[in-house]
Regions:
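Active-site mouth loops of central-metabolism enzymes
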Residues: 9-24, 78-85, 167-178, 253-265
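N-terminal small/glycine-rich loop or linker at the start of catalytic domains
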Residues: 1-18, 70, 111-119, 152-170, ...
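N-terminal beta1-alpha1-beta2 module of alpha/beta enzyme domains
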Residues: 1-67, 71, 171, 285
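Acidic (Asp/Glu)-rich catalytic clusters
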Residues: 32-36, 61-70, 92, 96-102, ...
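Short, acidic/polar
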Residues: 20-34, 88-91, 176-185, 260-273
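Internal, glycine-rich beta/alpha segment that forms the wall or movable "lid"
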Residues: 2-4, 84-189, 204-223
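Alpha-helix-loop-beta-strand connector modules within alpha/beta enzyme cores
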Residues: 54-75, 132-139, 295-308
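Hydrophobic faces of well-ordered beta-strands that scaffold small-molecule active sites
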Residues: 6-10, 41-43, 73-75, 103-107, ...
Length: 308
C-alpha cells in the first residue's frame, strides 16, 4: 500500500495586518500540531495580490526551514520569471546544504500579470514563459550536476557558472503543469508533477495527457511523483466547514476551482479517487489562522484513515 503524505501550505497572504508576534505564534501552534504527521511545509511565491499583505516566498521559507528542522520544505510554486535561474540554482543549493537535504524545488512558468507589471517584470506570452521555464530547468540541473555550468539559450545564458557546495542529495524538482507544453516539459525534466485546485474529473483527463507526454519523451510515468495542492477545510459538519472556510474556499466545486471541504469522512471520500490515480502527496492550505480545526482533524482522523 502506498503511503500518503500531507504537506502544509502556510499562510502567506490575507494576513489582515496581523502583528508579527501574533502571526508567528499562530504559525508555531500550527506546526507543533502537525509535527510528526505532516511531512513538509510549503509557501506560495507571489509578490502581491490586490491590497492583501503578502510574504515573499524564498525569504519566508528560509526562515521556517531554519527554525523547524523536522520538516521538508518547498514552494507551490516558484515563479521562474522573478529570479535569474542561475541564482535560483545557487539559492536552492545553499538551502539544501544548510538544511541537511530537506529542500524541494517547486517551480512553474508564472501567470499573474498584475504582479509582473507592478514589480516591473516583462509579461511575455504563455508560450514564451514556458520556453523560459525549460531553459531555467536546464540551467539549474547543469549547475547542480556539472563542475561548471555553461548554457546558451534564447532567453538565459551562463558561462562557467560555479555552484559549490553542490546540493546533496539533489533536490527533487516539482513542476506545476496543466497544458500540453507544460506537461511535456514536466515529463522531460521533473521528479514531481503537481496540480492545484483541480477536480478529479479534470485530473483524470490530465493523467492521460501526462502519461502520453512521458511516453513521448521515453520516460516511465511511474518515475514521477504525483502531488495535488489546494484548499482544505475540515470540520465536524459540512456547514461548519463552510463557515470556517468562508468565501476563500470553494464549497461548490468546479473542474478548475476545487477544494476539499467537509467532514473528515467526506474529505477522505474526496481524496481517494486522486489516490487511485496515483497521487500520494497532498499539499493543503488549511484555512489560515487562528482556527486550527482543519489541522486537528486531518492529523487525528483523515491521515490515519488514508494510511490504515
Amino acid at each position: 500500500m502506498t503511503k500518503i503524505h500531507f504537506g502544509f501550505i502556510m499562510p502567506a497572504d490575507q494576513l489582515d495586518k496581523t502583528k508579527r508576534s501574533t502571526y508567528v505564534e499562530d504559525l508555531n501552534r500550527a506546526l507543533k500540531l502537525i509535527s510528526g504527521q505532516f511531512e513538509s511545509i510549503w509557501i506560495i511565491d507571489h509578490l502581491q495580490s490586490g491590497n492583501e499583505d503578502m510574504l515573499e516566498g524564498f525569504t519566508t521559507l528560509t526562515y521556517i526551514a531554519a527554525l523547524h528542522p523536522q520538516f521538508k520544505f518547498g514552494h507551490t510554486v516558484l515563479c521562474q520569471s522573478f529570479r535569474n535561474p542561475a541564482l535560483v540554482a545557487k539559492m536552492g543549493g545553499t538551502l539544501q546544504f544548510l538544511s541537511g537535504g530537506r529542500f524541494i524545488l517547486g517551480i512553474g512558468a508564472g501567470w499573474n500579470e498584475e504582479e509582473y507589471r507592478s514589480y516591473g517584470y516583462d509579461f511575455p506570452p504563455g508560450r514564451v514563459r514556458v520556453e523560459q521555464l525549460e531553459e531555467a530547468l536546464q540551467i539549474i540541473k547543469s549547475m547542480w550536476t556539472e563542475e561548471r555550468g555553461t548554457f546558451e539559450g534564447r532567453y538565459y545564458r551562463i558561462r562557467e557558472a560555479f555552484c559549490e557546495p553542490k546540493p546533496t542529495p539533489l533536490p527533487p524538482i516539482m513542476v506545476g503543469a496543466f497544458g500540453p507544453k507544460m506537461l511535456h516539459l514536466t515529463a522531460q525534466y521533473a521528479d514531481w508533477w503537481n496540480v492545484s485546485s483541480t477536480s478529479v474529473e479534470r485530473y483524470r483527463r490530465l493523467v492521460r495527457d501526462f502519461e502520453r507526454a512521458c511516453l513521448d519523451v521515453g520516460r516511465d510515468p511511474a518515475q514521477i511523483r504525483r502531488s495535488w495542492g489546494g484548499g482544505c477545510v475540515c470540520a465536524p459538519t459540512r456547514e461548519a466547514a463552510k463557515t470556517i472556510g468562508g468565501d476563500r474556499y470553494n464549497a461548490e466545486n468546479s473542474d478548475d476551482d476545487f477544494d476539499f471541504v467537509g467532514t473528515p469522512e467526506l474529505i477522505i471520500e474526496q481524496m481517494r479517487p486522486f489516490i487511485d490515480l496515483g497521487v500520494d502527496y497532498f499539499m493543503l492550505d488549511c484555512g489560515g489562522f487562528p482556527n486550527l480545526t482543519t489541522l486537528e482533524l486531518l492529523v487525528g482522523e483523515v491521515l490515519p484513515a488514508l494510511n490504515a
